[in-house]
């Protein structure tokens, strides 16, 4: 997976899967400061209800 792609998909679909969130938390120690700012922004969008958390794999597009 790639953080940029996850962020783009979440913004376009308005949904992020638990699998993607797990990947972010497992790999955050490798992220740059810019990457971390994107993760913080993603968290704010989730907190504000703009991006929903979805357990279904159908939100994950290959």
Regions inferred by a protein language model and the residue ranges of each:
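Short, charged early-sequence alpha-helical segments and their helix-coil boundaries
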Residues: 36-62
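N-terminal acidic leader/helix
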Residues: 1-33, 56, 60-62
């Amino acid at each position: 997976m790639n953080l940029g792609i996850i962020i783009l998909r979440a913004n376009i679909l308005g949904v992020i899967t638990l699998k993607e969130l797990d990947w972010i938390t497992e790999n955050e120690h490798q992220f740059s400061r810019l990457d971390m700012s994107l993760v913080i922004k993603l968290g704010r969008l989730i907190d504000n209800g703009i991006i929903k958390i979805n357990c279904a794999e159908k939100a994950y597009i290959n």
